[in-house]
């Protein structure tokens, strides 16, 4: 059965009450995991490519996020350890598994003491081998996104984890927001299966334009985990609204993901997509 991750990302806007409502809504929708990001603004580093950004043929290839502007924005979204523990308690209350993305080596020790079920590595850290090694030494489950990563880097990460005898999941990911279906490259899922038994997808397609089509197609390619950004706010009230599903869309995804493969294929044949 395919597992669903509701990614709160920055959609909680640093508001504990909003975060609480989001966890409750995600649980009601039937997800398996709810995820936050343990990002701290003071851990940010200046990266020249984010100062400029890159847009080609009206598609955002590199998000423009200048350091100072991003620092001032993220500072309002910082989650203290107390707030992260509150998030975990909410997940336990609503019977979903708490999960977080870890960005910094110096945060691993303190986060490992909290009752997160799973740690995630963001796409741009798939080749951060020291971070990977240290996370592998924890007892948390490990999921790694692979967007924008070279095959040699994916292979190196897999080899490190296998040497450490750490089970892990790779998520196929296209770091274009939103991801056009023609850019989805789902064959990559088959490639990732060569490195680990469990693979999935971090779906950044547009819910308004494409519904759950990309996530469901990924299941046909063998995805066992689907991650989607989630919001309960209007799309224009959150930075990630364009790639975030709302409650009804998330609930539909959970329901559709439980269909058998034959039913999913029939759904695509009606749309002449499979």
Where are these regions (language model features)?
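Catalytic cores and adjacent flexible loops of soluble metabolic enzymes
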Residues: 1-274
